[in-house]
Amino acid sequence: VNWGYGGLSEFTYYRTYSRKKSDGTLETWADCVIRVIEGFFSILKTHSISSYITWDEKRAHKLAEEAAERLFEFKWMPPGRGLWMMGTPFIWDKGGAALNNCAFVSTIDIDAEMSKSFAFLMDMSMVGVGVGFDTKGAGKIASIEPEGSPELLIIEDSREGWVEALSCLIDSYLD
């Protein structure tokens, strides 16, 4: 593979985008290209079929081969997040949020939604998405000291578990 920018490019690829295979080795550039293209076209096929758009398997296969060849030769590149996550089980199991670079959440309805904005911010941050927000909800809520006995909360050690824990904590000070 002609990395184009010397050893630093290859180092960056293996450090950032190459995924560990089932045998414990890291993906080669060819492995990554196949994963990314198969991932992209599987999402495209699922979307097309669920949206009642005609799916031509033969045409898609030809396009996938052309895209893979061009990607392998660095004639085009997906976003870095596409190299990192496309074609992984994470996208099918957890959704495509990790393919996004940035997101936005409004606080305008914070008095009705309480912890929802904060939970979204944490959830997206935990998959590497930068999250912007406004201050339209400023002054709409006030924190209170929780009353009664502390409640034991068992936190699943997962992204979803920690997001739920944050929501419970924030809500305990806003109810």
Describe each model-derived feature in a short phrase:
Residues V1-D175:
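Extended catalytic cores of very large enzyme megasubunits
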